[in-house]
């Protein structure tokens, strides 16, 4: 379709999008055939530039604050018109996709992007349905115009770029943003607001299925191991990041994966390694003279990424969904070296640790967090993406766990034997052995040992894991130093948890001093 001197490219194939991106100088090909692009000064999400339009449907339903920032409806309309006019004056790309694999819960989306590569990214990450919108639902629109420059005084934005969600109009406006992860996370936030009304728990987690149909969920912030640990050659992948849990089903919201590439190796992450081929997009990955990706080079960012469709994963759930989970795993990257490699949680502890969302920002996906590593609490293991009050998600989690009798575990992929800089990080093979033990059922009813200050129960034996690793205190040369570190961590938990209005039973399930 042509509009006054420009072309609208609709539903191009992957090959055509790659060709357009190369012809327009948007990227280059790696030796694997993946398209390699750079995203400019933003190499991660920009939380300070994300807004939700305040209108009757959102006014009293959203937890407003520094994460969910209000944007006036009239300002949105003016900015949308301005960005749309800018985009319509040049070539752009349109694809029709779904968000949500379950037939009852998909959102039909018209995705418009200024660049070919961001359209390819969307085709990697969203679902490309055989038939678009068979239920005839109202359509959402994404308008993603990377080269538009916002003017804060005129547009009401925080900077030269913005991400604004308008629930009343079913629109997502992304302007001035080259980092494509904004697109997928915006639609995740949309589903996270809508799904609880349908009694579905939206989750920032990965999911996979065993040969017997048993499902495991992996909750965790970026860098804690969701993508790596769910990409298991012995199991079928559902997805690596965004899922819904309803009665009888866990479904992927996406049609692809978005893997961190820092230090990626074929040995440790063979599934991801093999998926990076023609049709995949590499963001901010440095190539050598032979067009070979150097995943150890962090000169552009620690948050280098690979986007690829699920079709690039040999063992996957063809239906993009599974049954309810037998095992729910909360992944935490503990910088203090205090937490054990695995703890078995009861329901109250599950609610406590879900609300706390304790972990570290590792090679953070957020702009402005720097390259360093620091501890953080992120409610529901994904605070930036959950617009409703946290308690609503926690109540749904407990309802789902109770309903299916799912077992819940806290798995530390961080440090042991001392804090960051002193101790050592658990190896991926060690964590994989912990996960395998959980999935085999070996820890159900296992004999445990109680750790007082952090108030956790650890199994006395885990197949494939050295026994001396299980109790973190025994790993520290200086036991008094461990106790002090444990008290310090407990204080952080207790201070963070003061903001939650929950039952005394849940409050008592956390660390105690």
Swiss-Prot record:
Substrate binds at residues 45, 179, 185, 305. Its cofactor is Mn(2+). Mn(2+) binds at residues 185, 204, 241. It catalyses: oxaloacetate + ATP = phosphoenolpyruvate + ADP + CO2. Keywords: ATP-binding, Cytoplasm, Decarboxylase, Gluconeogenesis, Lyase, Manganese, Metal-binding, Nucleotide-binding. Its EC number is 4.1.1.49. Binds 1 Mn(2+) ion per subunit. It holds the Pfam family PEPCK_ATP. GO terms for biological process: gluconeogenesis. ATP binds at residues 185, 204, 220-228, 269, 305, 431. It is found in: Cytoplasm. Pathway: Carbohydrate biosynthesis; gluconeogenesis. The keyword Manganese applies. GO terms for molecular function: ATP binding; metal ion binding; phosphoenolpyruvate carboxykinase (ATP) activity. One of its GO terms (cellular component) is cytosol. PROSITE patterns: PEPCK_ATP (PS00532). The keyword Zinc does not apply. Monomer. Involved in the gluconeogenesis. Catalyzes the conversion of oxaloacetate (OAA) to phosphoenolpyruvate (PEP) through direct phosphoryl transfer between the nucleoside triphosphate and OAA. Belongs to the phosphoenolpyruvate carboxykinase (ATP) family. HAMAP family: PEPCK_ATP (MF_00453). NCBIfam families: pckA (TIGR00224), PRK09344.1-2 (NF006820), PRK09344.1-3 (NF006821), PRK09344.1-5 (NF006823). This is Phosphoenolpyruvate carboxykinase (ATP). It comes from Pseudomonas putida (strain ATCC 700007 / DSM 6899 / JCM 31910 / BCRC 17059 / LMG 24140 / F1). The gene is pckA.
């Amino acid at each position: 379709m042509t509009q006054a001197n420009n072309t609208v490219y609709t539903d191009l194939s992957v090959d055509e999008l790659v060709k357009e991106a190369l012809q327009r100088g948007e990227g280059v090909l790696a030796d694997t055939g993946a398209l390699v692009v750079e995203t400019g000064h933003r190499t991660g999400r920009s939380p300070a530039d994300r807004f939700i339009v305040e209108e009757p449907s959102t006014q009293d339903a959203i937890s407003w604050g520094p994460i969910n920032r209000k944007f006036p409806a009239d300002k949105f309309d003016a900015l949308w018109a301005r960005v749309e006019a800018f985009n319509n004056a040049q070539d752009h790309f349109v694809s029709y996709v779904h968000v949500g694999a379950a037939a009852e819960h998909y959102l039909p989306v018209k995705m418009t992007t200024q660049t070919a590569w961001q359209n390819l990214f969307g085709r990697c990450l969203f679902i490309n349905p055989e038939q678009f919108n068979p239920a005839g639902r109202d359509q959402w629109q994404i308008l993603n115009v990377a080269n538009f420059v916002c003017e804060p005084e005129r547009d009401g934005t925080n900077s030269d770029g913005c991400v604004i969600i308008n629930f009343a109009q079913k629109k997502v406006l992304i302007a001035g943003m080259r980092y494509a992860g904004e697109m997928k996370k915006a639609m995740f936030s949309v589903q996270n607001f809508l799904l609880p009304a349908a009694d579905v728990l939206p989750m920032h987690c990965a999911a996979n299925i065993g040969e017997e149909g048993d499902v495991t969920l992996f909750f965790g912030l970026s860098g804690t191991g969701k993508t790596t640990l769910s990409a298991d050659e012995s199991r079928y992948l559902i997805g690596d990041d965004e899922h819904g849990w309803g009665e009888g089903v866990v479904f992927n919201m996406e049609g692809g994966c978005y893997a961190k590439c820092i230090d990626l190796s074929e040995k440790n992450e063979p599934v991801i390694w093999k998926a990076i081929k023609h049709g995949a997009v590499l963001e901010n990955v440095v190539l050598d003279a032979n067009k070979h990706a150097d995943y150890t080079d962090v000169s552009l960012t620690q948050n280098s990424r690979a986007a690829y469709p699920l079709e690039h994963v040999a063992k996957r759930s063809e239906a993009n969904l599974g049954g309810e989970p037998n095992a729910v795993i909360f992944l935490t990257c503990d910088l203090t070296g205090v937490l054990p490699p695995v703890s078995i949680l009861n329901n109250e502890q599950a609610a406590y640790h879900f609300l706390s969302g304790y972990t570290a920002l590792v090679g953070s996906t957020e702009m402005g967090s720097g390259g360093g590593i620091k501890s953080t609490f992120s409610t529901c293991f994904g605070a930036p993406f959950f617009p409703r009050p946290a308690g609503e998600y926690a109540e749904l989690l407990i309802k789902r766990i109770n309903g299916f009798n799912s077992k819940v575990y806290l798995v530390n992929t961080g440090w042991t034997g001392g804090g960051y800089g002193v101790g050592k990080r658990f190896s991926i093979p060690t964590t994989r052995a912990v996960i395998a033990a959980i999935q085999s059922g070996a820890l159900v009813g296992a004999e445990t040992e109680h750790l007082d200050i952090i108030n956790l129960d650890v199994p006395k034996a885990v197949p494939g894991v050295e026994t001396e690793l299980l109790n973190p205190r025994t790993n520290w040369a200086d036991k008094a130093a461990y106790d002090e570190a444990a008290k310090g961590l407990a204080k952080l938990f207790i201070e963070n948890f003061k903001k939650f209005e929950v039952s005394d039973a849940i409050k008592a399930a956390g660390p105690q001093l």
